[in-house]
């Protein structure tokens, strides 16, 4: 069963793996650093799916993301403005990253996030440290 696409306030990026394109949904309040984290991942070879607003839908117990047509391939670079970047039109979302500026547990219990009855792993992360991108990459690779 396929649920209708729904926009969600989040940024999404994807990395090519031997299993195909695998995506990460980066969530958090405005100004927390979602786009900044995405830009750092893009600098490591990832592709943008969508910035700020992401179409998210479930099909066969799998989550997928794409960009609204009006913002496809565009991302905000704070202090520079809206820039264009290569993008991945669609990808399977494997991991949710909840961005926060609050303290993050060093060894947290496993957490999940559910959208439209599909549950995926969830990582709580402060996006500001330089290592944040590598933490996301490591978490995705472990799935």
Predicted features by range, described:
Residues 1-22, 27, 59, 143:
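Extreme N-terminal, non-catalytic leader segments
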Residues 4-6, 49, 106:
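Short solvent-exposed loop/turn micro-motifs enriched in small/polar/acidic residues
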Residues 10-12, 53, 110:
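Short, acidic/polar N-cap/turn motifs at the starts of alpha helices
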Residues 16-22, 43, 47-101:
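Conserved nucleotide-sensing/catalytic segment adjacent to the nucleotide-binding pocket
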Residues 18-42:
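Glycine-rich phosphate-binding P-loop
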Residues 25, 49, 124:
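Short, conserved beta-strand segments within well-ordered enzyme catalytic domains
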Residues 34-36, 82-84, 110:
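A generic local structural motif
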Residues 89-143:
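Conserved NTP phosphate-binding and transfer environment spanning the P-loop NTPase/kinase superfamily
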């Amino acid at each position: 069963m396929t649920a209708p696409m729904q926009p969600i306030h989040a940024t999404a990026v994807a990395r090519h793996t031997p299993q195909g394109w695998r995506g990460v949904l980066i969530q958090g309040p405005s100004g927390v650093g979602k786009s900044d984290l995405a830009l750092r991942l893009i600098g490591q070879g990832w592709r943008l799916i969508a910035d700020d607003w992401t179409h998210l839908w479930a099909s066969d117990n799998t989550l997928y993301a794409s960009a609204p047509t009006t913002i496809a391939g565009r991302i905000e670079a704070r202090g520079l403005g809206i820039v264009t970047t290569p993008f991945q039109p669609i990808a399977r979302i494997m991991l949710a990253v909840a961005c926060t500026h609050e303290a993050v547990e060093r060894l947290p219990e496993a957490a999940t996030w559910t959208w439209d009855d599909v549950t995926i792993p969830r990582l709580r992360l402060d996006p500001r440290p330089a290592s944040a991108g590598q933490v996301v990459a490591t978490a995705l690779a472990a799935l």
